[in-house]
């Protein structure tokens, strides 16, 4: 009888615990907000927490990762190491969802942050110079932005053109960020060329070498208004399938692995050069806010219809392989495909991260 009673008690406890996990809903979920909607105290809290993470020691061995000097660099190195299996493919959206979650968890558990990771709505203020994410004009030294443009650097004829065939006026920056909270933000790994990204490409030689330099930006209003305008957002949310949704985010030249710019890449190149580095873009603090908005859009698409027209629940909709640009013969991804996160956290199956109010997640966007 004692054994039966114990088993019954254990079963009841498991049932209660399971019920607790399942209780997350829109009312009790933590809220991720747009940067411009945060209060000054909330903005300062996030900025301080990010700098706190920068002050903490790395968990990677320095002899193998000489460019990794702190916890922020742990996130950068992990992204570099996995670039070819987390971009332009099926794991892209779920992997970055978990990546942001791990970042938020580190801010909270290691730096005492009590907020969430904010996001950058590309369309809320498309004039990047006055967007709250980048605007330092109110008070350059104490700005509650993520810092603004870089110093002007005249473009060179040898600079790679990310979108050949389109004639955009050059930006006003290109050099080191001059003011705001992140003017002294260190950048340590890379830079890498987009030509180093192709299916089955190895991790670049000396990928983790220590190459200290400044955070560089070249805010490009013309590009953000071209690639990330309200019509693009409408198309994303109206996408009839996850394949179409992905293609709007990251376009590929038909019949090839060669990349073309979509909404995802548009956000990166509109802020670069640091954010435009496909391997090492998390070295720009705007990275998490950019990908936070992509996660918002994916979640909104997931919740906007019962199925994709292909008999697939949108919460389970997946398309593509586990390799960069989905080349022929690459392994098809499934909900059981395991994603790695290195020193940041334990591996996750794609199916474990498909719902932001399921599993270990409990958040929503507003």
Swiss-Prot record:
Presence of keyword ATP-binding: no
Record organism: Emericella nidulans (strain FGSC A4 / ATCC 38163 / CBS 112.46 / NRRL 194 / M139)
Annotated InterPro entries: Di-copper_centre_dom_sf, Tyrosinase/Hemocyanin, Tyrosinase_Cu-bd
Cofactor: Cu(2+)
Function: Nonribosomal peptide synthetase; part of the pathway that mediates the biosynthesis of the gray-brown conidiophore pigment. The first step of the pathway is performed by the nonribosomal peptide synthetase ivoA that catalyzes ATP-dependent unidirectional stereoinversion of L-tryptophan to D-tryptophan with complete conversion. While the stereoinversion is catalyzed by the epimerization (E) domain of ivoA, the terminal condensation (C) domain stereoselectively hydrolyzes D-tryptophanyl-S-phosphopantetheine thioester and thus represents a non-canonical C domain function.
Residues that bind Cu cation B: 291
Record bears the keyword Oxidoreductase: yes
Annotated protein name in UniProt: N-acetyl-6-hydroxytryptophan oxidase ivoB
Pathway where it operates: Pigment biosynthesis
Cofactor descriptive note: Binds 2 copper ions per subunit.
Binding-site residues, Cu cation A: 87, 96
Field pH dependence: Optimum pH is 7.0.
